[in-house]
Each structure stands twice: as C-alpha cells, then as structure tokens.
C-alpha cells in the first residue's frame, strides 16, 4: 500500500513538473536578432540555414520557415535585409526566401552591390543603384503590415536626428511607418560613407505627407540590434491580445537568438596608446566606427548574458558570434568570390566551435537544442489553438 501511495505521489510530481515545463515553454516569446555587417551577412546566413534545416527535420516539414517559429525578428543594416528576406510574403503568403537561399543571394548580388564605386573622396563609396534595384525586384510593393511575423528594423533620420524603428506593432499609432519594405531595407543598409542616404515619403493618419531622410540602422542601434528586438517583443507582450497571458514579460519568458557578423582580434592588436597619441581627426575617423561597433556588440552581449544568468535562464539566450576574423573577412564590402567563400567557411566552422570558454557546448549543439525548444513550443501552441 505504501509502495502504491509513493508511486502515486511520484507520478503526480512528475506530471506537475512536466505540465509546468510545457506551460512555461508555451508562454515563451521567441526573438531572433541579426547584426549588421555588409557582405559579412553571409555568416549569419549560414547559421540561419542550419537552424531552419534542423526545424524542418524535427517537424518533418520541408516547407517550415523561420518566420513560423519566431514572434519577433529584428535586424539592422544587412541584418535588416535578412529580416525582410525571411518575413516578406510571396504570392502564396509564405516567406519569399528560404534560409538556404540567403548565402546564394549574397554570392549573386554582392559583387554588383559593392562594385559601383564612385571613386569620390567627398561622397559615398558606392552609388546604391544596384542595391535599390534588387530590393525593388525581390520585395516588390510589400509593406511592413504584410510581414509574416513581427519585425524590428532600425534606421536613423538625419533630418529629425532620431532613430526610426519599423515594426508592425507601431502602425496603429503611427501609420506613416507602414513603408515599403524595399525603402526600409535600403535605408537600414545606407551606411554613411558607403551608400547615399535615402529619402522617401508616406502618409500620416490624417493623410498628410510624412518625409523620411534615413541612413544605416547601425547609427541608431549600432551593429547589434538585440536590445531593440527585445524591446519590441516586450511591447508586443504588453499590447497584443494574443499575448495576454504573458503581459508581465520577463527574460525568463523569452527565447533570444542573436546572430553576429563577426569581429576581429587583429584590430585590437594593431593600435597602441603610443601610436594613437599621434593621430589626428582623419586617422581617428577611419577606425572610430569599428571601435564603437565592436564595443557596443560586446556590451550588449555582456548585458544580456548577465541578465539571463542572474535569472537562471542562461539557456534562453544564445549569442552566435565569430570573434577572430582575419584578413579580408573583416571588411564589410569585400564581395570578391574568394572572400565570400571564406565568409561561408567561417560560418560553417563556427558551428563546430564552443559557445564560450566556460561552455564547451558547440554552436551546432546549442542551435539544435534551441531548435528543439522552438519546435516544441510551436507544437504546444498549435495544439492549444485546435481546442
């Protein structure tokens, strides 16, 4: 009798624990963030291809797409372009690009995007005409409200001196943000000195003309948009009726995948205090952006890692980043075939590397674990919706 009673108690405990785990997973808000970095977008493109492939295997569905699994997908610069590629609908209302089409996109169009150098010292390095052409061709007349999941794409308005964040959740209050995706993608990629700023106009809720004068989203969020994506997810959880059960969102209820485009350790070894003490404005101008982006990326990752660890939810956050780029792979605009091949190899090799010195788990293993959480959560929500 005692044995039977003990068995019943154990069974109830296991059931309660399992139910609690499933309920917790079902309530998770899932966020994907993709850094900027020009042609180095090949690196996160490789990671996204691996992740989507794992999801397709787990769910036995060759048509599974990343937009089916993430509540918010955010990006800046080339990360904004990737965001649009995997969330913009085609004629069948499915993402127009599968993840395995991202790297081929860079190989096909990268050399043309970064090949129209104006050769002017006082002007942008590239005219941006081919970039706009291919964006219009691929994205058509699609606007923000048509994205297949919530998006968060940043830019910076040089006339108002304010960041501009394009998201679906802002449209009710600010319909002027319902811009065409190709305008948004060009704007978030219009890095000063590389491409000309972008002007376009939409209409306000009163029908008045609303003008944008935009440059690269990295000016607003630097290169790592993870905190921006988290902020958009938090707002959605507070305002969207579909997320009523998790209005009090905290990091324990979030799954965050942040993809970098690589940094270099060579840069840190190149310059010393003794050398830079002799620098003038021009020399600092050439490297200050790289310094700022690297520092911001490290600090964003440090902050998020600390928060998730303090909440004992470190497995809810995964930052995938290569920190030892060398040679031509450090350049955002080297679209030579040889360099693009190197970048693709960097992405492949990254999967085999440990997540950190303190975590021997490889990125491949971590992404498989992350994919399992995404897959299980999607199934739980689908089952709930069927009742």
UniProtKB/Swiss-Prot annotation:
Glycans are attached at residue 115. GO terms for biological process: defense response; lipid catabolic process. It is found in: Vacuole. It is an enzyme of class 3 (hydrolase). Disulfide bonds: none annotated. It comes from the Eukaryota. Residues 361-385 form a coiled coil. Keywords: Coiled coil, Glycoprotein, Hydrolase, Lipid degradation, Lipid metabolism, Plant defense, Signal, Storage protein, Vacuole. Residues 1-23 form the signal peptide. Transmembrane segments: none annotated. This is Patatin-01.
């Amino acid at each position: 009798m005692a044995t039977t009673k003990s068995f019943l108690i154990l069974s109830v405990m296991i059931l309660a624990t399992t139910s609690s785990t499933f309920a917790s997973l079902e309530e998770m808000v899932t966020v994907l963030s993709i850094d900027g970095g020009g042609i180095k977008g090949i690196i996160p493109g490789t990671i996204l291809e691996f992740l989507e492939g794992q999801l397709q295997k787990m769910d036995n569905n060759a048509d599974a797409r990343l937009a089916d699994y993430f509540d918010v997908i955010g990006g800046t610069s080339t990360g904004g372009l990737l965001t649009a590629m995997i969330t913009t609908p085609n004629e069948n209302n499915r993402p127009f690009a599968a993840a395995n089409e991202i790297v081929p996109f860079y190989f096909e169009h990268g050399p043309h995007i970064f090949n129209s150098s104006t050769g002017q010292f006082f002007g942008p390095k590239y005219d941006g005409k081919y970039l706009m052409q291919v964006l219009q061709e691929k994205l058509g007349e699609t606007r923000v409200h048509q994205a297949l999941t919530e998006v968060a794409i940043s830019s910076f308005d040089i006339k108002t001196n304010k960041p501009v964040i394009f998201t679906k959740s802002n449209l009710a209050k600010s319909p002027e943000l319902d811009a065409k995706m190709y305008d948004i993608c060009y704007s978030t990629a219009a890095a000063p000195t590389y491409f000309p700023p972008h002007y376009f106009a939409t209409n306000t809720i009163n029908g008045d003309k609303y003008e944008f004068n935009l440059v690269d989203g990295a000016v607003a969020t630097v290169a790592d948009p993870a905190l921006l994506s988290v902020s958009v997810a938090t707002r959605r959880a507070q305002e969207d009726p579909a997320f009523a059960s998790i209005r009090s969102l905290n990091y324990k209820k979030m799954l965050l995948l942040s993809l970098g485009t690589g940094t270099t350790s060579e840069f840190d070894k190149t310059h010393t205090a003794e050398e830079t003490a002799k620098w003038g404005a021009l020399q600092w101008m050439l490297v200050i952006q790289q310094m700022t982006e690297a520092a911001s990326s490290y600090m964003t990752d440090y902050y998020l890692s600390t928060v998730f660890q303090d909440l004992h939810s470190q497995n809810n956050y995964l930052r995938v980043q290569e920190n030892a780029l060398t040679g031509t792979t450090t350049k955002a605009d080297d679209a030579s075939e040889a360099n693009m091949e190197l970048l693709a190899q960097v992405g492949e090799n990254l999967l085999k590397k440990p997540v950190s010195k303190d975590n021997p788990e490889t990125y491949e293993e971590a992404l498989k674990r992350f994919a399992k959480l995404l897959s299980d959560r999607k199934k739980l929500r689908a089952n709930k919706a069927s009742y």
